[in-house]
């Protein structure tokens, strides 16, 4: 359990504030995360890392000279939003472009991918690299699906040293790709982690057993085996990792590697050293030369009892980068002169301009806000159940993420009503708030979907049924484009597609929007229930697909819940589109 916190909702923000207060000589806080507080080389590439909070020293503790220039920090176990990532990247940018690098998780891929597109559009050259070192999470022929765990550190260190050496963005990206291809990790867990305010851990391990292949967000392992001795565990980890040698290495003898034995938060350093004693012996017996190993907590999983072993297969350049000096709050190598402090900067929130809207669109905005309030109420009533469903094969955080997102969206909608926003603008700003506060995969998906719907609704008129159906179809297409999910993958898409089709078909026959929405929502509910018979093909549940059989997808279920709640709003709205197919010409031109 977590003993010390104020409010669970403020934990991530307050830990960042405390971290910056403790390390002001190395980092400063910016909206969305932290950046170096010391001067970096003008014209150099900026390395921006990031992910959810709860993994310290990753990610903020790895910001400093010789390491990252900035870290985007999401909520606990939730990826930072694209808005947060962009904010950190802009603050870290030195004129030579930005490399975004992070562990390979669906939410991070979505948010960092969107941030890359925004930054490039702004004129800041940007590339990204998702770390894929966890050998338990996918076979070698599907390495792109592997998770990023403690191997994050190896990649972050290599690319940061390359940037310090003056490499340009393309060359830094090449180093990132090579370092990633030469990094392998495997871990075990003895117990799950419990987040602040939670009564139960995200997952449990049967007494006397250990879960092999867990993820750093508490994802269950691929198999449970009896807890072994320290030497037996070392042998399991080393033998598993040596079965998968990077391409181009034909013999172990004479190879140079670096090693990280990483504690996940609940294993004592003394225990780690006992395990490393045997790890070192086994590697030397294979003729390997170990270069500057690290033993300790480097990429944790809050208070999970567990550890992981990472092998970093060096070439001449990667060894030079691994051994290069670094001075970050939680990671130091060699010696560096103190950095030149930067002048204090005050970040002023950007003024949010509200576009003009017609009276008809402003009236419709009240209905949109009511729909978001209804979504909030249904999610809050089902947070625990959504988390339970998600925990069957995932990390169990879906309910918490949806709660954060929908509350932020409903609050933003209220603010937009007070500022006389039209329906489209209100929904788009609510979408941004949802994505920013929820983080994670669900935050990215809902942000993309509601933004697309809001764009189609616009601020010029009261949307009729056809326009709403067009907006839902655009939302579906945007979600599939950014999330890469297809029908049958056991995701929200499996409920969204039938909803969109049913809504379009019914409004095209002349059915009123409230009635069409209600019937389409029923189709979505049935489709969501039917996902129980599917096996997940993407996301964190994929490695444990069989465990999810018989349980519906949490994202599809939450979507169906919200669609049903919105149906009640539409049917109770006396000024709904069913009695107002179009606004008056005077209103639409006002």
Curated annotation (Swiss-Prot):
Keywords: ATP-binding, Carbohydrate metabolism, Kinase, Nucleotide-binding, Transferase. GO terms for biological process: glycerol catabolic process. One of its GO terms (molecular function) is ATP binding. The active site is at residue 217. It comes from the Bacteria. One of its GO terms (cellular component) is cytosol. It holds the Pfam family Dak1. It catalyses: L-erythrulose + ATP = L-erythrulose 1-phosphate + ADP + H(+). Residues 7-331 form the DhaK domain. SMART domains: Dak2 (SM01120). ADP binds at residues 398-401, 441-442, 483, 540, 553-555. The keyword DNA repair does not apply. Residues 366-568 form the DhaL domain. Its EC number is 2.7.1.209. Pathway: Carbohydrate metabolism. Involved in catabolism of D-apiose. Catalyzes the phosphorylation of L-erythrulose to L-erythrulose 1-phosphate. Can also phosphorylate D-erythrulose and dihydroxyacetone in vitro. This is L-erythrulose kinase. It comes from Pectobacterium atrosepticum (strain SCRI 1043 / ATCC BAA-672). The gene is lerK.
């Amino acid at each position: 359990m977590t003993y010390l916190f104020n409010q669970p909702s403020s934990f991530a923000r307050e830990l960042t504030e405390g971290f910056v207060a403790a390390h002001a000589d190395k980092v400063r806080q910016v909206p969305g995360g932290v950046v170096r507080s010391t001067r970096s080389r003008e014209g150099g590439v900026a390395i921006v890392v990031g992910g959810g909070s709860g993994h310290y020293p990753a990610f903020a503790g790895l910001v400093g000279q010789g390491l990252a220039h900035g870290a985007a920090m999401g909520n606990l176990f939730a990826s930072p939003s694209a808005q947060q990532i962009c904010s950190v990247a802009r603050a870290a940018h030195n004129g030579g472009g930005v490399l975004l690098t992070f562990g390979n998780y669906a939410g991070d891929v979505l948010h960092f991918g969107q941030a890359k597109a925004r930054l490039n559009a702004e004129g800041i050259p940007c590339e990204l690299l998702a770390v894929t070192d966890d050998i338990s999470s996918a076979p070698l022929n599907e390495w792109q699906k592997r998770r990023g765990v403690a191997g994050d550190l190896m990649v972050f260190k290599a690319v940061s040293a390359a940037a310090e050496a003056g490499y340009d963005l393309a060359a830094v990206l090449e180093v990132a790709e090579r370092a990633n291809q030469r990094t392998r990790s495997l871990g075990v867990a003895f117990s799950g982690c419990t987040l602040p305010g939670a009564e139960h851990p995200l997952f449990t391990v049967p007494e006397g057993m250990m879960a092999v292949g867990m993820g750093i967000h508490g994802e269950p392992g691929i198999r449970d085996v009896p807890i072994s001795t320290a030497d037996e565990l070392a042998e399991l980890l080393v033998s598993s990792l040596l079965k998968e040698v990077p391409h181009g290495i034909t013999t172990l003898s004479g190879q140079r590697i670096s090693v990280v034995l990483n504690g996940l938060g609940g294993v004592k350093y003394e225990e780690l050293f006992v395990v490393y004693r045997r790890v070192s012996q086994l590697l030397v017996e294979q003729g390997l030369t170990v270069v500057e190993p690290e033993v300790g907590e480097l990429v944790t999983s809050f208070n999970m009892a567990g550890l992981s072993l990472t092998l970093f297969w060096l070439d001449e350049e990667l060894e030079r980068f691994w051994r290069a000096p670094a001075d970050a709050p939680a990671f130091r190598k060699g010696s560096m002169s103190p950095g030149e402090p930067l002048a204090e900067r005050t970040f002023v929130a950007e003024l949010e301009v509200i576009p003009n809207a017609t009276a008809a669109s402003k009236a419709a905005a009240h209905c949109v806000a009511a729909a978001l309030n209804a979504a909030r109420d249904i999610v809050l009533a089902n947070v625990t159940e959504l988390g339970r469903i998600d925990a069957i094969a995932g990390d169990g955080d879906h309910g918490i993420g949806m709660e954060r997102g929908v509350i932020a969206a409903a609050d933003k909608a209220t603010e937009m009503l007070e500022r006389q926003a039209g329906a489209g603008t209100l929904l788009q700003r609510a979408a941004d708030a949802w994505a920013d506060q929820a983080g994670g995969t669900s935050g990215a998906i809902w942000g993309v979907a509601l933004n697309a719907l809001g764009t189609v609704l616009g601020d010029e008129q009261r949307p009729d049924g056809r326009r709403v159906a067009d907006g839902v179809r655009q939302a579906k297409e945007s979600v599939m484009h950014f999330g890469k999910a297809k029908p049958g993958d056991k995701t929200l898409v499996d409920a969204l597609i039938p909803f969109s089709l049913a809504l379009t078909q019914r409004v095209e026959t002349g059915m009123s929007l409230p009635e069409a929405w209600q019937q389409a929502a029923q189709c979505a509910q049935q489709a969501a229930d039917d996902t129980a018979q599917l096996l997940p093909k993407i996301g964190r549940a994929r490695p444990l697909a069989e465990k999810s059989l018989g349980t519906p997808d949490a994202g599809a279920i939450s979507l169906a819940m919200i669609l049903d709640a919105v149906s009640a709003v539409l049917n109770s709205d006396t000024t709904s589109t069913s009695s107002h197919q179009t606004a008056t010409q005077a209103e639409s031109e006002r």
